[in-house]
From Swiss-Prot:
Subcellular location: Cytoplasm
Family under the similarity heading: Belongs to the ClpX chaperone family. HslU subfamily.
Keyword annotations from UniProtKB, A to Z: ATP-binding, Chaperone, Cytoplasm, Nucleotide-binding, Stress response
Residues where ATP binds: 18, 60-65, 246, 311, 383
One term of GO molecular function: ATP hydrolysis activity
A Pfam short name: AAA_2
Source species taxonomy: Bacteria, Pseudomonadati, Pseudomonadota, Alphaproteobacteria, Hyphomicrobiales
Record-linked PANTHER family: ATP-DEPENDENT CLP PROTEASE ATP-BINDING SUBUNIT CLPX-LIKE, MITOCHONDRIAL-RELATED (PTHR48102), ATP-DEPENDENT PROTEASE ATPASE SUBUNIT HSLU (PTHR48102:SF3)
Protein purpose: ATPase subunit of a proteasome-like degradation complex; this subunit has chaperone activity. The binding of ATP and its subsequent hydrolysis by HslU are essential for unfolding of protein substrates subsequently hydrolyzed by HslV. HslU recognizes the N-terminal part of its protein substrates and unfolds these before they are guided to HslV for hydrolysis.
SUPFAM superfamilies, sorted: P-loop containing nucleoside triphosphate hydrolases
GO cellular-component term (any): HslUV protease complex
Subunit comment: A double ring-shaped homohexamer of HslV is capped on each side by a ring-shaped HslU homohexamer. The assembly of the HslU/HslV complex is dependent on binding of ATP.
Protein name: ATP-dependent protease ATPase subunit HslU
């Protein structure tokens, strides 16, 4: 788990996301509070519960991007799910407890990756011996092995093909056990029941270079205690897990509506115990959810936060409102982030030998077009910039292979020539921009 201070977390998010200071502060404090709780002892640590967050704001202003960047920063098990993917228990579809099961799988993969690094040196030696066995045979003399080992370490044998025995991928057929609680837990792999069937292997023909990572991972896994690894992963989920629930507004029940809304309310009711704290059965063991941090987000265009069940509102105590993007924000989004759209397009066309240059007035014009179309057609926030940029650079992208070595300057006139008419014609921009 990361121990960044809130200020460091915000400054890291600032590298990729423009504006939305309140939302950044809220998630930074929530993330730091996870670390603070782990410094406490005994009963107090158990009593301190996470303050779950509800992010409210129109589409395309950075809600999901904040979640994505937070996942990379957190160094903790993180899962982003759409609330609309789930159905009430008893209906066909996934139930909300699957969120926790998926989170456990994410944690196991993270812990396994970390532990593999701890035993990498030993795994590398064992993998090297397996490659030498394939090259010169297990019964070869020490002198021959040493000679080939030197060549192997120098990289002289990287292109040589060898045959190695590797673990067969666990693509065991799945079947459902009727009546098992929690819907998806009923899908059991035959491999889970009968174990690894004596460790099934298959012979693969690979180059020495390609076999390197596969063999190291296999040898590392042999050195790991799987039961201890799973237990550690469950512990990490219970104390550090973060779930980002997107599109929470789509499961709101609006006043005066009925019929299909029933299962939406059911999903909310199923979420209540999960967020409040319950024990979820997974195939790896029971997982307590009291200390998992939930961050919910929604545009709330049609529904309002007050349309959520009152109990669910109470379980999301921190409200953060994200602002709609202004023209100045659009301009900054085009230029400031480390992987801004303009930098991406310049890099893409550089691969063809074409140098793109954007003048300041071109950036102003792009921002103006995006804001104009958002205000007249449908406000989709920063995502509109991608549509506008694609339209502006359509011709250049098409002919780039024939124009290697050229420098092309994009100015306001060029932008207007390519999208100006479409932006003014509302009927056309509905379909094209």
């Amino acid at each position: 788990m990361t121990d960044f201070s809130p200020r460091e977390i915000v400054s890291e998010l600032d590298r990729f996301i423009v504006g939305q200071a309140d939302a950044k502060r809220a998630v930074a404090i929530a993330l730091r509070n996870r670390w603070r709780r782990l410094q406490l002892e005994g009963i107090l640590r158990e009593e301190v519960l996470p303050k779950n967050i509800l992010m409210i704001g129109p589409t395309g202003v950075g809600k999901t991007e904040i979640a994505r960047r937070l996942a990379k920063l957190a160094g903790a098990p993180f899962l982003k799910v759409e609330a609309t993917k789930f159905t009430e228990v008893g209906y066909v579809g996934r139930d909300v407890e699957q969120i926790i099961r998926d989170l456990v799988e994410v944690a196991i993969a993270q812990v396994r990756e970390r532990k593999r690094k701890d035993v990498q040196a030993r795994a590398q030696i064992a993998a090297e011996e397996r490659v030498l066995d394939a090259l010169v045979g297990p019964g070869s003399s020490p002198a021959t092995r040493d000679s080939f080992r030197r060549k192997l370490r120098a990289g002289d044998l990287n292109d040589k093909e060898i045959e190695v025995e590797t673990q067969a991928s666990s693509g065991s057929p799945m079947f459902e056990i009727p009546g098992m609680p929690g819907g998806q837990i009923g899908a059991i792999s035959i491999g889970d029941i009968f174990g690894k069937m004596g460790g099934r292997t298959k012979t693969r023909r690979l180059t020495v270079a390609d076999s390197h990572d596969i063999l190291i991972n296999e040898e590392a896994d042999k050195l790991l205690d799987n039961d201890q690894l799973v237990q550690e992963a469950i512990n990490v989920v219970e104390n550090n897990g973060i779930v980002f629930l997107d599109e929470i507004d789509k499961i709101c029940v609006r006043d005066g509506r009925s019929g299909g809304e029933v299962s939406r309310e059911g999903v909310q009711r199923d979420l209540l115990p999960l967020i409040e704290g319950t024990t979820v059965a997974t195939k790896h063991g029971a997982v307590k959810t009291e200390h998992i941090l939930f961050i919910a987000s929604g545009a709330f265009h049609i529904a309002k936060p007050s349309d959520l069940l009152p109990e669910l509102q109470g379980r999301l105590p921190i409200r953060v409102e994200l602002n709609a993007l202004t023209r100045d924000d659009m301009r900054r989004i085009l230029t400031e982030p480390e992987a801004s759209l303009i930098k991406q397009y310049i890099a893409l066309l550089q691969t063809e030998g074409v140098t793109l240059e954007f003048s300041d007035d071109a950036i102003d014009a792009l921002a103006d077009v995006a804001v104009g179309v958002n205000s007249t057609v449908e406000n989709i926030g920063a995502r509109r910039l991608q549509t506008v940029m694609e339209r502006v650079l359509d011709e250049i992208s098409f002919v780039a292979p024939d124009r290697g070595g050229e420098t092309i300057r994009i100015d306001a006139d060029y932008v207007q020539k390519n999208v100006g008419d479409l932006a003014k014609n509302t009927d056309l921009s509905r379909f094209i921009l």
